Amino acid sequence: MHHVRMVKLPAEASDPHALRSRARRSWLVFAAVALVLLAAGLLLARDYGRSQALAGLAGQSRIDASLKASLLRAVVERQRALPLVLADDAAIRGALLSPDRPSLDRINRKLEALATSAEAAVIYLIDRSGVAVAASNWQEPTSFVGNDYAFRDYFRLAVRDGMAEHFAMGTVSNRPGLYISRRVDGPGGPLGVIVAKLEFDGVEADWQASGKPAYVTDRRGIVLITSLPSWRFMTTKPIAEDRLAPIRESLQFGDAPLLPLPFRKIEARPDGSSTLDALLPGDSTAAFLRVETMVPSTNWRLEQLSPLKAPLAAGAREAQLLTLAALVPLLALAALLLRRRQVVAMRSAEERLARNALEASVEERTRDLRMARDRLETEIADHRQTTEKLQAVQQDLVQANRLAILGQVAAGVAHEINQPVATIRAYADNARTFLHRGQTVTAAENMESIAELTERVGAITDELRRFARKGHFAAGPTAMKEVVEGALMLLRSRFAGRMDAIRLDLPPDGLQALGNRIRLEQVLINLLQNALEAIGDSEDGAIQVRCEEAAGGIALTVADNGPGIAADVREELFTPFNTSKEDGLGLGLAISKEIVSDYGGTIEVESGPSGTTFAVNLKKA
């Protein structure tokens, strides 16, 4: 008979009602803590996501701005060549020396043709006094011929320095543009100035289509080129009145008031960019990220505004979703642990109450308890037996799976080592013959080749073992010339007398693909073997092997003039164990495709009555 010693516990620990009350309080505290954590996590995630999105947007915006600046430079550089060439033109110089009507008419037509072909807004010739004597727009109502440009900086600076570039509003056309000028010199000194005007309508249209406001400013901060026409000739910062007066008097920007750009809340960032609010046409305000870069070969600065609202919202949303994805499972786990603890405590309390209530009758129920214990031990034993049987079944399943994989590997090895083994046998027969003849040097060379081929057999079996378990050889730069030569070496003995049918274009030494030499040799051997078997003993049989660069990669092609592949066979050509040969296993092309796929390449096949072409496309190293 068993005697149970009773231990008195605190009332709260053994009272289920007290435990339930405490559990409700615990859940209220847990809910409050969870809400605080979620709120704090979402707020922090929002700020972090916005910060990361802003950094990413800044990087992309700098790339966009640099690209725009490079394209703008290309446009300007293309037009700079016109005045440079025309300044040395004999006809231009002759027209300034003898400005008669026939010579000026010829110059007008010449400039008109040049402006059309070079996409210049206008090209015009100014004499020594500053009056335009010829222009590409000589037939238009806004012709520059006869106008006095002596006050223009691009004329004065070109006469003084030989060349000048000046952005201004046209006094006749009322269209802004860049004036590129060169002095025309004669035997006695300056004869005049040739000017090409470049307008940026196409550039501005492209910028406008991008949806990101962009503009170019000069060294004074005045906007010259912009995707928003209303911002033209505005300034990035206020200009002092004593500096504004001479700019307005020069008529460089017409009657533009030169007001500051409508930017507010400008905040600089450590990376050189800044955020701001801009008033857009239509009285709408939006937040932007501003980045800037210099336009090469000019003193211009290109600034681009990237909208902030959508990227920041997306960054905050993504970070908050990730935070929820992390916090919700953790909170769920915490709730589960809390619930489990409460259930365990409640169960323990109930058990203790039941034990206290049955304390008086424990002696009478000892026998029943012993019997219950025996039944429990029996059930435990049964459970252990069931568990052992289940483990045995699981081990049988694992063993069966291993046997299936070993079957695939064995089938692959039987196919792939057939080629080098046949070559080894041929080398061995030749070595024996050479030994009988006393040609020991040649026999030794054959034995060395056999040693190399045995190493290659070991490499092939290792490769096929890895193929059967979906393994991968590390990819690296592989010389395609060595791949082609290695494959031909393996096939030379087996197909002796038929190798002359192969027409080979060896790749250059420096041509390297991304892959592994031995595995790529396997692919080429399979393709060449199929091609040699396809042409058979035909006297006019031919195989063309070519390896060259193509479409950013490397194309290795094997083409034969055999009878081609039947349509029903071609549909499942790369399916394992699918073959039309009596002694074939149907694994060669399947393995080849798997090898090429491992290195990011593809195999394509074209077949017809006149022959079959396999194309292996690989990545260039």
UniProtKB/Swiss-Prot annotation:
The modification Phosphohistidine is found at residue 415. InterPro entries: HATPase_C_sf, His_kinase_dom, HisK_dim/P_dom, HisK_dim/P_sf, Sensor-like_sf, Sig_transdc_His_kin-like_C, Sig_transdc_His_kinase_DctB. Its EC number is 2.7.13.3. Autophosphorylated. Its main location: membrane. CDD domains: HATPase (cd00075), HisKA (cd00082), PDC1_DGC_like (cd12914). Residues 1-26, 339-621 are cytoplasmic. It holds the Pfam family HATPase_c. Residues 46-320 are periplasmic. It is a multi-pass membrane protein. The chain crosses the membrane at residues 27-45, 321-338. Member of the two-component regulatory system DctB/DctD involved in the transport of C4-dicarboxylates. DctB functions as a membrane-associated protein kinase that phosphorylates DctD in response to environmental signals. This is C4-dicarboxylate transport sensor protein DctB. It comes from Rhizobium meliloti (strain 1021).
